[in-house]
Amino acid sequence: MKCEVCGIEFPDGINPNGCRPYTMCILCMHLQRLGLPFKYLSASIADYKNGLSKWFDSKNSLFIHGGVGTGKTWLMSALMRESIVSSAYHYKRNIFKEEERVTYKRDYLFVSFPEIAMKIRASMNSRTSETESTIVEKYGTIQNLFLDDIGAEKSSEYMQSILFMLIEMRNTGRNRRTVITSNLSLNMLAQQHGERVASRIAEMCDVVKLSGSDRRLQ
């Protein structure tokens, strides 16, 4: 059977509730559970020719910035997919059979900062188990965070403090890797959202700039 997203062949199988066959491969379903939007599930680093393959050999975080529509989220999604694939654990379900199974790590999350801000606002106005601190801790402590679209939120002292708290938690934690995208350069981020945030990102991240016109309009 062929995955409807990435096109790879995978064995026929019935989903857990038995209602219908799978239409996506295990990797694409896993990525979707980790928060990656459907439209980015098939993103591949093969789409980029800028030497980012060396990023996988480093332990550095990454800050990707550029204008609207230059492919920042697509690139970040490709890095997430490739990182999960390269760290997968392969094993044989039965030593007497040649069939190989694979387990993908779960210590990855994809989220946009506007989504985090929305969750925090919702926690203040409803009776949920989530609070500001639990939301920040969730994304601040996961080993691999793919944080999309920082700087898109309207700047306020409160949201600046939330963003700084999150970045600081990731910067000071052990073995925490972060990939961040923004329409703003670090200088612009400092002007609009505070120097502390921009300084911490510069400290922890390699910087990649994507240039060009809006690909969505071409």
Please report, for each region that a protein language model flagged, where it lies by residue.
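GG-anchored amphipathic helix commonly corresponding to the ABC/SMC/Rad50 NBD signature/C-loop
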Residues: 77-85
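A short, basic N-terminal segment
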Residues: 1-54, 207-208, 212, 218
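Walker A/P-loop nucleotide-binding motif
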Residues: 59-78
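Residue-level preference for the first positions of well-ordered beta-strands
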Residues: 61-63, 107-108, 144, 177-179
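Short glycine-rich substrate-engagement loop in P-loop NTPases that contacts/grips substrate
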Residues: 84-141, 157
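Short, well-ordered alpha-helix to beta-strand connector turns
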Residues: 59, 142-143, 204-205
